[in-house]
Structures are given as structure tokens and as C-alpha cells.
Amino acid sequence: DMTPRHLAEAAKRAGRKAGFRVKILDERAIKKLGMGGVLGVAKGSAEKPRFIILEYLKGAKAQKPLVLVGKGVTFDTGGLNLKPEHGIYEMHMDMSGGAAVIHGMAAIARLKLPINLVGLIPAVENMPSGSSYRPGDVLKTMSGKTIEVLNTDAEGRVILSDALYYGTKYKPGLMIDFATLTGAAHVALGNYASALFYNREKLAPKLVEVGRRSGDYVWPLPLWDEYLPEIKGTFGDLANIGKGDRYGGAIHGAKFL
């Protein structure tokens, strides 16, 4: 029975055991920050959102932190764009990105590595109800950018947009997000590799090699500017899915972020 509150409590327990700091923002604090993406996706659920902040700052003061951002959708029905029967039963795992960040933080803290590390997890449920966000809604995110919602089942990128922007306040040397985003990535690469998107050419081969050594494979997909017009919004800055056809869905999600 995993909800945003339970995920936040699990993060606290991990922090106490491993030795990193945990701060939890409730719905009121999330509203104060203007995280319209997180609030929009969470609207349909009786479970209130949480924004989980993990800090392990054991490096030099001058060292820019590594910021890890994990998708924390504790159950994803698809919202009003409801998922089909065959795809919905395992959607308790849509918080895997957030879980990866918590466990990564715990491993690094236990190893007592001399680095500065921050973890950020927007935690929500995406549920259908009379109060759910709807196709056609326009959400204003923390960055000030607006999102035109074309499909409520493309919610991961909506909440991650707020988390990534929040992460910039740490002035990171590097920011990496982890997410079950998207089904199209699964179609492209099957069961044995995750899609890797990057805006640093030199970093990609290193991540591919780390994946090869660990057995947790990643493979690069393009992030070219040619895809940008396909996610331009009509009534908002960006649409949360590509317009026109279903091709390139994984790339649209990454380009959106």
C-alpha cells in the first residue's frame, strides 16, 4: 500500500539508517512554491502530494552537487485517459525512479563518499475522479512555463518539470533524472535496457559503460531539436504529448523535460 505519504516515510527511514538528511514538503508548501505540475496531477486523488528532498553534503563547499531526480507516481491509473486493463495492474511500480534515487542516496551515504548529492522526488497518485486534471487543462509550472495537457496519462514529465526546475536552485554540476518514462521507450528497447537521453556528449559513453558493467543497461536515443515543434502547445508553452501521431513518444517526453 504505497502512497505519496508512505513513500515520504520510507525516505525518512532510509535517511535515518544511512545518514542523509530528509525534508518533506506537504501540499501547502508545494502550492507556495508554485509547482502547478505536481498539484495538477495530484488533483484527482484523495492522497495528497509530497515533495521529497534528500541531502547528503559531504564534499567540499566549492564542489557543485550532483542532483538526482526520481519520478514518484505511487500509482498511475492514467487519470481520465484511463490505462487499458492489461497495463494497469503493475502501475504501483511507477515510482521506481523515486525508489532508485532513495536507494542510490542510501548506498552513497553508507559508503561515506566525499561528494555533495541531492535527491528530489515529486510524489503523487494519478487517479480519475470528479476533481482530476483534464485533457485541455493548462498548468503553470514552477518555472513559469505553461503545459497544455493533451493526455492525462503523460503525467510523469509534468511532475518532473517542477522537480527539475527546483533542482536548479542548487546550481548543480550535473542533474540526472530517473523515470518510468515512457511506454514508448519500452517498445523501442524491450525488457533489457533503459532509454538514455542526454545533453552532454562526453557523459553518454560513460553512462553506457557503467550500465554494461552493472548489468543495468542503458542505450542512447536522440534529443534533436527537430522534435521540438511536435510538442509546442497551442494554448500553453508546451504540450505534454507529441501532436499529430504516436511516433517518437519517448523522445517527446525527454524533449519536453
Predicted stretch roles:
Residues 1-7:
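Short beta-strand to alpha-helix junction loop
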Residues 8-257:
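A generic structural signal for tightly packed, nonpolar segments enriched in small/aliphatic residues
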